[in-house]
């Protein structure tokens, strides 16, 4: 029997308090293929050894509590306990460590992100022995992944539904986000889609407020959708936000969207909750709806480098819970996002397999087997001058979403959409011809603007607009 296992049957029950590391720090342990692995950034309180801090995280997120209990003797701790099996000091930090914890698969309910997070990032984040705690990454085993449906459709199915290939998709968030009547809202949707966009979008906090009830919005948006499709000959979509105060109300809205013939609905997966999101994702697959996911509230969780949860974990959780798109930052826009870190979780969203990559903040090799990929959405403070960089950074399998960068055009909404479509087509053509978007991007946009007055006007309006603030969440310094 392992020396870490003390049960009533083996040694007799002894009341009292003992160090966590005596039971939960097991450096000799070799993780199993079926274990869920977690990498925590741990900042212990002064005087708390790293081994004790790592063991405390493993204990409090699995079977442990602050004192020995006699009911330990009624089960096998060796089978169910989490184990801190490796600790690395963080380079450049005096008292900070990456603690690796392995969790037996039996600790988690099948197909439930809610249960997985309740255990791994539950009460342990308020533990007094730690000054700060951050979950940097998870390795989800194939055996657990296969208990989830995942995204309703995935990248290839979405492209087939839309009949659009070889370029990023273009979107626009309708602004002002609050205050428009349903009819005026639908008018903006129509103008943007007619101008050349693939999608328009409800903002995350557009639900069913007194100035615009959800049913009215859905009806006017559906009218705009079908009218623009008839005029352009292209398949169009509007992300109808089904997020609501109850799961029942959320599902009622999704059902109505399907009855209208809408191709896509939307959900705020963090504020709405993983249980609601998984429920909606299952409905979307069964009924042919695409599912756009907004990450409202994510920065409360992931923006600080030392405490909370890195977005790559939330991205993996979304791929399990289900969504066809998710907002992933822009690198170049107004929202937080360091380039290498962003590309790391973009790979986790889209690829079937990712390897450990410290340069992108990826701590574990992750296989997704047959789970469909998710399209990353770049949105927030972007405009036509950003198009070359966005095309180069995110590639074809992405959605580039311009809200103010469409609706702020001096000539109106439709010309704003035209400007973005022309800029995108110019960048894709230049890339396909072998030109360097990173080096020649501005030249490519200027050349295209010579034969597009809409693009020329947009270039003039936003030529001085930049958001050059350093990212808060950056990669650790490399060891010398």
Curated annotation (Swiss-Prot):
CDD domains referenced in this protein's UniProt entry, alphabetically: RuBisCO_large_I
Record GO biological process: photorespiration; reductive pentose-phosphate cycle
Catalytic activity: 2 (2R)-3-phosphoglycerate + 2 H(+) = D-ribulose 1,5-bisphosphate + CO2 + H2O; D-ribulose 1,5-bisphosphate + O2 = 2-phosphoglycolate + (2R)-3-phosphoglycerate + 2 H(+)
Cofactor(s) annotated in UniProt: Mg(2+)
Location in or out of the cell: Plastid, Chloroplast
TM spans (from-to): none
Entry note: cofactor: Binds 1 Mg(2+) ion per subunit.
Any Pfam family: RuBisCO_large_N
Residues marked Transition state stabilizer (site): 334
Modified residues (N6-carboxylysine): 201
Entry annotation: catalytic residues: 175 (proton acceptor), 294 (proton acceptor)
E.C. numbers: 4.1.1.39
Gene Ontology terms for molecular function: magnesium ion binding; monooxygenase activity; ribulose-bisphosphate carboxylase activity
Record: residues binding Mg(2+): 201, 203-204
Similarity comment text for this entry: Belongs to the RuBisCO large chain family. Type I subfamily.
Function: RuBisCO catalyzes two reactions: the carboxylation of D-ribulose 1,5-bisphosphate, the primary event in carbon dioxide fixation, as well as the oxidative fragmentation of the pentose substrate in the photorespiration process. Both reactions occur simultaneously and in competition at the same active site.
Name the UniProt record assigns to this protein: Ribulose bisphosphate carboxylase large chain
């Amino acid at each position: 029997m392992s020396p870490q296992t003390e049960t009533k049957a083996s040694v007799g029950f002894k009341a009292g308090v003992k160090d966590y590391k005596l039971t939960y720090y097991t450096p000799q342990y070799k993780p199993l293929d079926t274990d869920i692995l977690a990498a925590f950034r741990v900042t212990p309180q002064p005087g708390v050894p790293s081994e004790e801090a790592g063991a405390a995280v493993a204990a409090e997120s699995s079977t442990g509590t602050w004192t020995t209990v006699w009911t330990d003797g009624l089960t096998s701790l060796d089978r169910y306990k989490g184990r801190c099996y490796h600790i690395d000091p963080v380079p450049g930090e005096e008292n900070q460590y990456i603690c690796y914890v392995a969790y037996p698969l039996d600790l988690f309910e099948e197909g439930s992100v809610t249960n997985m997070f309740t255990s791994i990032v539950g009460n342990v984040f308020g533990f007094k022995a730690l000054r700060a705690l951050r979950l940097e990454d998870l390795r989800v085993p194939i055996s657990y992944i296969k208990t989830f449906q995942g995204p309703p459709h995935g990248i290839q199915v979405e492209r087939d539904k839309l009949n659009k290939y070889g370029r990023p998709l273009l979107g626009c968030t309708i602004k002002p986000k609050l205050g428009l009547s349903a009819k005026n809202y639908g008018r903006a949707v129509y103008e943007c889609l007619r101008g050349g966009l693939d999608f328009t979008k409800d903002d995350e906090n557009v639900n069913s407020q007194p100035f615009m009830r959800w049913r009215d919005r859905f009806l006017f948006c559906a009218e705009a959708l079908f009218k623009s499709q008839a005029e352009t000959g292209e398949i169009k979509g509007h992300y109808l936000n089904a997020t609501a105060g109850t799961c029942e109300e959320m599902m009622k809205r999704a059902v109505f969207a399907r009855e209208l013939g809408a191709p896509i609905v939307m959900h705020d997966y963090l504020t709405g909750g993983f249980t609601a999101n998984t429920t909606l994702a299952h409905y979307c697959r069964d009924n042919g709806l695409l599912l756009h996911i907004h990450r409202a509230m994510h920065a409360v969780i992931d923006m600080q480098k030392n405490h909370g949860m890195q977005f790559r974990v939330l991205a993996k959780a979304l791929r399990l819970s289900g969504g066809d798109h998710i907002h992933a930052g822009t690198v170049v826009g107004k929202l937080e996002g360091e380039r290498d870190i962003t590309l790391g979780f973009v790979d986790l969203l889209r690829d079937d397999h990712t390897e450990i990559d410290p340069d992108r903040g990826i701590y574990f090799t992750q296989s997704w087997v047959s789970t469909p990929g998710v399209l990353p959405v770049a949105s927030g403070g972007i405009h036509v001058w950003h198009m070359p960089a966005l095309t180069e950074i995110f590639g074809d399998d992405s959605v580039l979403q311009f809200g103010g960068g469409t609706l702020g055009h001096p000539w109106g909404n439709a010309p704003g959409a035209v400007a973005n479509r022309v800029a995108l087509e110019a960048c894709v053509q230049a890339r396909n011809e072998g030109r360097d978007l990173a080096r020649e991007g501005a030249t490519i946009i200027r050349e295209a603007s010579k034969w597009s007055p809409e693009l020329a006007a947009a270039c003039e309006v936003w030529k001085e607009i930049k958001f050059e603030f350093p990212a808060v969440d950056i990669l650790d310094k490399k060891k010398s």
